[in-house]
């Protein structure tokens, strides 16, 4: 039968080189990846066979076999799962089914642990075999196809691969690794069992290896050796981890299971394992990762929760079980009530699925609330009676974890304000921000309320592109002068999210960059009277400024928020900030073409200089453009701005 040579997808050869060399010291992960792939292939067969039992042929017992041949220097991982046709072998093994190939290569850092984590995230687990092999041969036959339609795929990991049709009686796939000289350890049964026990013990299918026994040499003086008996034995527990009692599962086993389903190299931040009984019965094992994946901001990415029904795998991207803002959650949900032939359409419509989703969201939020509660826990808090509280080791281990979580996933969590009305109040309590009293995002709305000045009627905040821009915004000047704390919000999602949160625990949220500032009881009568008098005296100048800036500003008015700066830009109450409008335009989306309001400080020297100046028109435009620059924007015509400034400096 003729062989056909194909070239790898562009960049794959380079990627193989990087994978091989950047992960060399973590080479045992290849076995984790290949066993996981074999298990997935069996899961897929089981799912397809729900509607076509003939796919089982004469082998209904699904399993993974691992064998080695010292003479040939090969290690083989075989499954009797769904298998591949010739075209599927070309499609699945000759290309990387991710648009992020270049991202993968760019993110390889030389840090062995971090790079190992990327392997599974980018869907390149199969290629990790080249860490230990200088050639890989794959033989496969798809379930349901005749034996004559088997396929052999082979590559040395360079620029191309060969494919040929073969006779293959057995359904499923064999991955044959031709080991490098320095991968001798993987021709040792003890080593292979150790790696399987470490990474794949939880796999619900049996993983089989040939039994070995010690045999003395028949020749005097020669050492004995381990020989294969021809019998096969199961070398893993072969039971789904989530079905076992919690008391029988160690933290290490929970962590290893997480690494297997998430392809993450790091331990999770926390997890929750529960059996829920009631109107609908299901088991959930949910994890919160310690690090954000590379594609966290891809809202179309598959959800990280696998769905099982009565321990039968159904799908691994069950987005109906977890909302988009919790797309970082990994884990397993096993339902006792859903039909085995559940479709995606049924998932979206099922009452049971809605109950499972609601329960799972509440479980995740409870995990986060628990971490947040212990984040600031004093290891030895002194009580009112002078006796130090004893902090448990479990509580001590949670300290600092919410800060770690929020640094990775806080911005995504904010999306929930607009997506999950039922849990909006719980989500609001979990949010953290920087403020004028703290550069780190550690201030909750509750913290802010507890520090509000007497007579303060609102929670004040400002949105900006960067922390520096927020901290130095002219719009904060009157708040700094009066010692009023302002929350500093610098995530792109902030302003959008806060459209869905008008108040916190009855206290309204107020942007310092929207509408007129009314400090209410925090402003004494003398200040109010002086501001009114200044506005009245400045009316003629305001009229001239409005006329000069009629194409740029919706209005010009005397400020109540500036102390040291000559001017600032604000928008009307309920309007879109100039920052959000810029972000939308940068993303190629339409934004309302609303003009901002220019507020001027009549006490500033530059503003006073306007009166009677022959350069009034130029100064007015400079005033506007500088206010725009101060909030992170750019003048509409930078060249004209520079020309005006130069003319005044000359």
Swiss-Prot record:
- According to the record, the residues making up region (B) are 345-582
CDD domains linked:
HATPase_Hsp90-like
Q: Where in the cell is it found?
A: Cytoplasm
Q: InterPro entries, per this entry?
A: HATPase_C_sf, Heat_shock_protein_90_CS, HSP90_C, Hsp90_fam, Hsp90_N, Ribosomal_Su5_D2-typ_SF
Q: Which Pfam families match?
A: HATPase_c_3, HSP90
Q: Where is this region: A?
A: 1-344
Q: What keywords were assigned to this record?
A: ATP-binding, Chaperone, Cytoplasm, Nucleotide-binding, Stress response
Q: Which residues form a coiled coil?
A: none
Which residue ranges are recorded for the region named C?
583-650
Organism's domain of life? Bacteria
Query: What GO cellular component is one of the record's annotations?
Result: cytoplasm
UniProt subunit comment: Homodimer.
Role according to the record? Molecular chaperone. Has ATPase activity.
Q: Which family does it belong to?
A: Belongs to the heat shock protein 90 family.
> Any idea what this protein is called?
Chaperone protein HtpG
The organism is: Acidovorax sp. (strain JS42)
| Upper classification of the organism | Bacteria, Pseudomonadati, Pseudomonadota, Betaproteobacteria, Burkholderiales
């Amino acid at each position: 039968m003729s062989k056909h040579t194909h070239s790898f997808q562009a960049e794959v050869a380079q990627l193989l080189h990087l994978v091989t060399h950047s992960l060399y010291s973590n080479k045992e992960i290849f076995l984790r990846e290949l066993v996981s792939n074999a298990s997935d292939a069996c899961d897929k067969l089981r799912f397809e066979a729900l509607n076509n039992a003939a796919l089982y042929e004469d082998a209904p017992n699904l399993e993974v076999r691992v064998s080695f041949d010292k003479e040939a220097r090969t290690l083989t991982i075989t499954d009797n799962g769904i298998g591949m046709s010739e075209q599927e072998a070309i499609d699945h093994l000759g290309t990387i089914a991710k648009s992020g190939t270049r991202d993968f290569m760019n993110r390889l850092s030389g840090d062995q642990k971090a790079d190992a984590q990327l392997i599974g995230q980018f869907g390149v687990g199969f290629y990790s075999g080249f860490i230990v092999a200088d050639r890989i041969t794959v033989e496969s036959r798809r379930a349901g196809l005749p034996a004559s339609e088997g396929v052999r795929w082979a590559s040395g990991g360079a620029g191309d691969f060969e494919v040929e049709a073969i006779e293959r009686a057995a359904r499923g796939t064999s991955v044959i690794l031709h080991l490098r000289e320095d991968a001798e350890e993987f021709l040792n049964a003890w080593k292979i069992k150790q790696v399987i026990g470490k990474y794949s013990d939880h796999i619900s299918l049996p993983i089989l290896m040939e039994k070995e026994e010690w045999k003395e040499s028949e020749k005097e003086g020669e050492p004995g050796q381990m020989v294969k008996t021809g019998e096969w034995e199961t070398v893993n527990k072969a039971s789904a981890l989530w079905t076992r009692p919690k008391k029988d599962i160690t933290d290490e086993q929970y962590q290893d299971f997480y690494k297997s389903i998430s392809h993450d190299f790091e331990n999770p931040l926390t997890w929750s394992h529960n059996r829920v009984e009631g109107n609908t019965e299901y088991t959930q094992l949910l994890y919160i990762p310690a690090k954000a994946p590379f594609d966290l901001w891809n809202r179309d990415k598959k959800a990280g929760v696998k769905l099982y029904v009565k321990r039968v795998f159904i799908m691994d991207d069950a987005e109906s079980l977890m909302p988009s803002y919790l797309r970082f959650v990994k884990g397993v949900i096993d339902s006792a009530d859903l039909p085995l032939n559940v479709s995606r359409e049924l998932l979206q419509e099922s009452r049971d699925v809605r109950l499972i989703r609601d329960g799972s969201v509440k479980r995740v939020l409870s995990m986060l609330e628990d971490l947040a509660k212990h984040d600031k826990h004093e290891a030895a808090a002194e009580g009112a009676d002078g006796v130090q509280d004893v902090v448990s080791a479990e509580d001590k281990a949670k300290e600092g974890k919410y800060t770690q979580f929020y640094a990775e996933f806080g911005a995504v969590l904010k999306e929930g304000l607009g997506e999950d009305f039922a849990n909006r109040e719980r989500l609001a309590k979990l949010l953290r921000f920087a403020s004028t009293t703290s550069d780190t995002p550690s201030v909750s709305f509750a913290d802010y309320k507890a520090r509000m000045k007497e007579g303060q009627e609102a929670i004040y905040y400002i949105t900006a592109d960067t922390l520096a821009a927020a901290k130095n915004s002219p719009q904060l000047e009157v708040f700094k002068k009066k010692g009023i704390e302002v929350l500093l919000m610098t995530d792109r999602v902030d302003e959008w999210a806060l459209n869905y949160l008008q108040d916190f625990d009855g206290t309204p949220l107020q942007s310092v960059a929207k509408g007129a500032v009314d400090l209410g009881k925090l402003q004494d009568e003398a200040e109010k009277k002086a501001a009114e008098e200044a506005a009245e005296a400045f009316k003629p100048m305001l009229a001239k400024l409005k006329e000069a800036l009629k194409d740029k500003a919706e209005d010009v008015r005397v400020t109540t928020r500036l102390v040291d700066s000559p001017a600032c830009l604000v928008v009307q109450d309920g309007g879109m900030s100039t920052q959000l409008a810029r972000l939308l335009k940068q993303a190629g989306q339409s934004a309302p073409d609303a003009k901002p309001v220019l507020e001027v400080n009549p006490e500033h020297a530059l503003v006073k200089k306007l009166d009677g100046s022959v350069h009034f028109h130029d100064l007015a435009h400079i005033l506007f453009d500088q206010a725009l620059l101060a909030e992170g924007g750019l003048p509409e015509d930078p060249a004209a701005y520079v020309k005006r400034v130069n003319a005044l400096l000359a």
